Amino acid sequence: MEQLRAAARLQIVLGHLGRPSAGAVVAHPTSGTISSASFHPQQFQYTLDNNVLTLEQRKFYEENGFLVIKNLVPDADIQRFRNEFEKICRKEVKPLGLTVMRDVTISKSEYAPSEKMITKVQDFQEDKELFRYCTLPEILKYVECFTGPNIMAMHTMLINKPPDSGKKTSRHPLHQDLHYFPFRPSDLIVCAWTAMEHISRNNGCLVVLPGTHKGSLKPHDYPKWEGGVNKMFHGIQDYEENKARVHLVMEKGDTVFFHPLLIHGSGQNKTQGFRKAISCHFASADCHYIDVKGTSQENIEKEVVGIAHKFFGAENSVNLKDIWMFRARLVKGERTNL
């Protein structure tokens, strides 16, 4: 009933305005080191028992906090997602609740209905075509290894990393996704992130710090970059700069699953093309919401709620939990809590 009331409140506000072979399922780091040497077989904390992951895959995720599945999403699906994104850019479709983001270096006078103007769309839960990504059997089969059978799609994004303007604003600072999430436990949350084309260090691939998912949530804020920082691009304020990093070179359809405490980011896009990826954060429907007031997450709560009030009016009483309950969609099993 509480979920329905929260969703109804935001609806009113908005109204106002197939398993791969074992050889194909591997991680492909291109820098840094990874390890499973310290893993103790009797201790599985981050993966659940089923017949999808091999023992080696479970060990890898347990130790490193991420796992790359090669060639998981078919080309045909990726092309459909690309086509829908282009329609959104041309304003041919306007899904309810969608957030469209542009690079901080693009002035308002330059805005035009073009793929070149949009760096990311998120919250596409009302776009049937893009949201298909969150329901693909190929994706959910692996998601269930981390969340269990009752699965909620919590946060959706299609990222269109632009060529860097020279100010390095196409970078994404090192961060932990849990900073943005007012729900727990973290071990029952996972991100699926799929490359929509060849992704390398040249066009700004993901970089991860293996094993950092075993730590705690660190304080985040905007980094002090001379060229500016994009909206919501919070970064960790305190981390080991010399810690080993792994750059994930991926091909179209490759998908990385990673823990929300894993420290990760991405570099500049040094090419003239737009680097595309589509992703969804999934959580067990058995997770619960928390109050982030008085914690390191309070700054992102104030920012998100402030943006909601800006768009929907401060007279509408919307809190962070309402916003997340409105975004959340059941994709498998039963909606037991979230």
Swiss-Prot record:
One of its GO terms (biological process) is fatty acid alpha-oxidation. One of its GO terms (molecular function) is carboxylic acid binding. Keywords: Cataract, Deafness, Dioxygenase, Disease variant, Ichthyosis, Iron, Metal-binding, Oxidoreductase, Peroxisome, Peroxisome biogenesis disorder, Phosphoprotein, Retinitis pigmentosa, Transit peptide, Vitamin C. 2-oxoglutarate binds at K120, M157, H175, Q176, D177, W193, S266, R275. Its cofactor is Fe cation; L-ascorbate; ATP; Mg(2+). One of its GO terms (cellular component) is cytosol. The modification Phosphoserine is found at S317. It holds the Pfam family PhyH. InterPro entries: PhyH, Phytyl_CoA_dOase-like. It is an enzyme of class 1 (oxidoreductase). Its EC number is 1.14.11.18. Fe cation binds at H175, D177, H264. Gene3D superfamilies: q2cbj1_9rhob like domain. The keyword Lipid metabolism does not apply. The keyword Oxidoreductase applies. Interacts with FKBP52. Interacts with PHYHIP. It is linked to Refsum disease: A rare autosomal recessive peroxisomal disorder characterized by the accumulation of the branched-chain fatty acid, phytanic acid, in blood and tissues. Cardinal clinical features are retinitis pigmentosa, peripheral neuropathy, cerebellar ataxia, and elevated protein levels in the cerebrospinal fluid (CSF). Half of all patients exhibit generalized, mild to moderate ichthyosis resembling ichthyosis vulgaris. Less constant features are nerve deafness, anosmia, skeletal abnormalities, cataracts and cardiac impairment. This is Phytanoyl-CoA dioxygenase, peroxisomal. The gene is PHYH.
